[in-house]
A protein has these predicted regions:
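Glycine-rich beta-to-alpha transition loops that act as phosphate-gripper elements at the mouths
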Residues: 90-93, 114, 203-204, 222-229
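Conserved hydrophobic/aromatic pocket- or pore-lining residues that grip, position, or stack substrates
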Residues: 137, 213, 235
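Catalytic cores of alpha/beta
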Residues: 122-124, 227-236
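Glycine-rich beta-alpha junction loops
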Residues: 139-143, 227
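A structural motif corresponding to the C-terminal end of an alpha-helix
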Residues: 208-221
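N-terminal capping/small domains of soluble enzymes
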Residues: 2-138
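An N-cap/entry alpha-helix motif that binds or orients negatively charged groups
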Residues: 2-49, 157-205
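Short acidic active-site motifs
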Residues: 95-98, 209, 230-232
């Protein structure tokens, strides 16, 4: 359906950030060296000292079940097959426990700022109990971005159906029938749809919160979204 395609394919605001990222990436070049024996070669790598079979990982993405039934499970199984990290979004449409199971331990949980310390500690304990060794804390989204595609198409989670959405779904029967048989995508880590607000402010995140998180999380902690060298140095 159009509203889901534009959610996946689109970008925030006028798309200038995405365009700038693409422009920069196009300027990267690989410089090869000649006359080096490469009969024995491997893509094996280490990501934060964790051995992997590929020098990549799968970024955390919320509600990927909207793209297709079983999408979360496929991501987790792919991570297991190639022994690469898969980021589990707080807003994932499959539970963090199932991600840990299907990925065979290659899942890293991505956490947003939470003002409620009691709920945060409850979630951290749940993540630990599921066997997670790495936590990703997102710091570059203090407020949710302006997403005109979602506003224009009326995309909301949980799904709210109106004439526009029903007409869109009717034009894509394969997706609609499969989704109807399996149920509308929902947040996999929260049984109460009101317990997680995708658009909630995360503006309260600060250095004190990071220290608090470091004190309450015993395993590896990855900070996602650091764009300033001074911040990176301070985080060491």
């Amino acid at each position: 359906p159009k509203l889901l395609f534009e959610y996946i394919d689109g970008a925030a605001s006028d798309g200038s950030g995405e365009a700038e990222n693409r422009r920069i990436i196009r300027h990267f070049r690989l410089k090869t060296k000649a006359l080096i024996n490469v009969e024995q070669r491997s893509l094996n790598h280490k990501v934060f000292r964790i051995p992997t079979k590929l020098p990549v990982g799968i970024a955390p993405m919320g509600m990927v079940q909207m793209a297709g039934v079983g999408a979360d499970e496929e991501f987790a199984k792919f991570a297991s097959k190639y022994e690469i990290p898969v980021g589990v979004s707080t807003a994932a449409s499959m539970s963090l426990e199932k991600y840990a199971e299907y990925s065979r331990g290659y899942a890293w949980f991505q956490l947003y700022y939470m003002a409620d310390k009691a709920e945060l500690e409850k979630l951290l304990n749940r993540i630990l109990m599921a066997g997670y060794k790495t936590l990703i804390f997102t710091v570059d989204v203090p407020e949710i971005g302006f997403r005109p595609n979602e506003i224009r198409n009326g995309l909301k989670v949980p799904f709210k159906f109106g004439p526009k959405q029903i007409f869109d779904f009717a034009l894509h029967p394969a997706w609609s029938l499969k989704t109807l048989m399996n149920g509308a995508p929902k947040f996999g880590n929260f049984t109460d749809t009101n317990s997680f607000n995708r658009g909630a402010s995360r503006a309260g995140a600060d250095w004190d919160f990071l220290r608090y998180l470091r004190d309450h999380w015993p395993n590896k902690l990855v900070i996602k979204g650091v764009l300033n060298t001074d911040d990176a140095i301070n985080m060491k």
